[in-house]
Amino acid sequence: MNAMNNISEVNTAPATRQASAAQNVVKTDEQKADAFFNESIFDAEAASFSHKHLTDHMAYQEGMEVLDSTLLDEVIAARDGYDYNRYTEADVRRALAHEQRTPADFAALLSPAALPLLEEIARSAQRERQRYFGNNVTFFTPLYIANYCENYCIYCGFNSHNRIHRARLNREQLITEMEAIAKTGMQEILILTGESRKMSDVHYIGEACKLARQYFKVVGVEIYPVNSDEYAYLHECGVDYVTVFQETYNSAKYAQLHLAGAKRVFPYRFYAQERALRGGMRGVGLAALLGLDDFRKDAFATGLHAYLLQKKYPHGEFAFSCPRLRPIINNDKIKPLDVHERQLLQVVCAYRLFLPFASITVSSRECARVRDNLMLICANKISAGVNTGIGGHSAKQELGDEQFEIDDNRSLEEIYAAMERLHLQPVLAEYVYV
């Protein structure tokens, strides 16, 4: 497999952002005992804040909808009980031999025992990709419409404690951005905001989605989690699907990383996809931010979360994103913990083999070489013409700063040509409304 030959160790391109001035962090006893403590994320300010009184990250805040569901308990229990070191080569080969794979098979495919068999796994994943998606690669682009945020997520460039330029697009600016994107030929758009109900309320997002429907055939949102009735409203405004990153499924680590704001509430975020499906959304996307914690356990929990949702809501469409941690403004030291390119390939292939019908996106966080090869092997959806700043598609100068650094700056035209060179079929829209 030619693509396998191009998957090498992690890209070590030099960071371009100014590092945070305070890099020496005094670890707590809990952090010292944590084998997956990612020191690159923490700075002195975060360490100081974490010693203050913090709210219970498992307690719902006022106005948050509570579902009568057991999915959270099932997923967290399975994640905590997942001992990937107990799996053997025989377990991995057994998983590869199955036509329909179980959660136990998925666990084996994510284990260290699977790495020596990565080429065989990739070939199997490629066959599943061909079976369900043929040579198709679906294109989309993100549109960041606001970067105000009320959360304190210490690894995120938008977090409320990070000193960046903030902006929110008005109606005229939204139209200008959408027209600029539409002129490239793009027909699917993903609308994103920072997590601030005050500065980017649901009505504002809904109005942006109504505008987007005038220019694009498919509209998705990646915003702060909302209640079922609010997802229903956004669906009425033209939204087809909702993506929410859980970031990490390790509840204790989640509490260390999300120090303030609505995002601190772990269960409310976990149930976002279920509320979206109840609100009438056609599809939902899930992801862990690989490198925040033990990536194998987080990938296992992500896959199991989607699996259980699919059993409960068989009409829904499900998708995975596979992001790795990236540097941000004011901290260029951030890096994914032990998630090199071989490990990333293992995760994406495991997703494909476990839920072969699910869409898999590889974002512009990855370099062009890795993205192209993953499309050839197991992924089927790619972003193009990406700008994570506010107003970056049409303005000569961004109105607001970006969320994180990207590693693939290619235009739609350039990625379209790259896919054709790989004998893949670019697809700009998969749906027709009648």
Residue ranges and their predicted role:
Residues T141, M178, I205-C209, Y231, ...:
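Generic structural signal for well-ordered alpha-helices
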Residues R131-Q173:
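Canonical Radical SAM [4Fe-4S] cluster-binding loop centered on the CxxxCxxC motif
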Residues S160-E177, I181-A276, R282-L286, L292, ...:
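Core AdoMet radical
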Residues H235-Y241, G280-R282, P356, L376-S383:
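Glycine-enriched alpha-helix->loop->beta-strand junction motifs that scaffold or abut catalytic
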Residues S228-E236, D293-Y307, C367-I377:
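Catalytic cores of alpha/beta
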Residues A125, C153, I191, V244, ...:
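Conserved, mostly hydrophobic/aromatic
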Residues Q100-V137:
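An N-cap/entry alpha-helix motif that binds or orients negatively charged groups
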Residues M1-A114, K311-V434:
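Auxiliary Fe-S-binding modules of radical SAM enzymes
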